Amino acid sequence: LAAGNAVVWSPAASTSVCAVKLAECIVDAELPAGVFNLVTGPGSVVGDEIVASPGTNAIGFIGSTETGYKIAERAAGKALLLEMGGNGPVVVLDDADVGKAVEASVIASFLCAGQSCTAGELFLVHEAVHDEFRDKVATRAQGVRLGDPFDAATNMGPLNNEPVAAKMDEHVRDALERGAELVAGGARVSGFPTQLYYEPTVLDQVSEEMEVARDETFGPIVPIRTIRSEDDALATIEESPYGLLAAVFTRDLARGLRFAEAARAGWVNVNASSNYWETHLPFGGRAGSRSGIGRVGGRFAFDSFTELKSVVIDLG
């Protein structure tokens, strides 16, 4: 809209009611008829038609990698801005302020029950501070209060839907079968109006072949993998199919900046939660990764929703 385009919005089917409420606000703003349009329904039907329509010139999408790939295939030749999945590596180096790293990690993994593309998904912790980090983050996880999200005393609400919860179940099960140690949580919680409440979970002794180390869990989980050096962490980030965001903790700012430059991610936070980002800065995945293409944030999204035109004039 800000770039001068008419918009057709197809929200996730599970958020249709919220989308309608927002659309009502937009209608109340008295935009000209036809400038903003809302179409609800299954993405495989409604979204597919919108993406493939000859009248659609550019597509912006935030969601799963699998859906993003389908959109890219259907929208061949059109401008794309795709912000997709991540495996948010959080790196705790040997000189880190462990207390600060723990508090930031709790936010990274348990804010919105871990249902964020910027959530902490894999914790690469140096062996020198591993035990302290593990014990402290487990204590914080056990102190998280589950409940009604509208209750001010609640720290964490439920997962969004059954497929998300089932994926959390699968990642925990797979990790434990492959030798991970369950330090905290690890199961759904009964006694709530829905079976989608999940214990804040901490896993230790995570290894590279586990699903939780390779894929996006999208749940309240802290999977810890021990590293012996910065190079170990950088190699793990390099090998990941994702490349959206990373975080690193160190008391040495110069070291943190060197790490940020070397890490193959579209965004790196130094001594801050992976969930922290500034909306005016460019945000998106590294080239060739499963995390998307293009950049959201401030003026940078305009690159995908405007035409760059060259005009040559002969003044002779």
Predicted regions located by residue number:
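Structural detector of well-ordered beta-strand residues that form the stable sheet scaffold
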Residues: 1, 8, 37, 81, ...
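Rossmann-like NAD(P) dinucleotide-binding subdomain of oxidoreductase/dehydrogenase enzymes
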Residues: 1-100, 227
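Hydrophobic alpha-helical packing residues
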Residues: 19-22, 36, 86, 137, ...
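Hydrophobic packing residues within well-ordered alpha-helices of enzyme cores
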Residues: 19-22, 50, 71, 133, ...
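Conserved C-terminal structural/oligomerization subdomain of aldehyde/semialdehyde dehydrogenase
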Residues: 31, 56, 91, 145, ...
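Short glycine-enriched loop/turn motifs at secondary-structure junctions
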Residues: 33, 53, 84-86, 116-118, ...
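Conserved residues at the C-terminal ends of beta-strands
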Residues: 39-42, 62, 108, 250, ...
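ALDH superfamily catalytic-core signature
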Residues: 58, 66-207, 230-231, 270
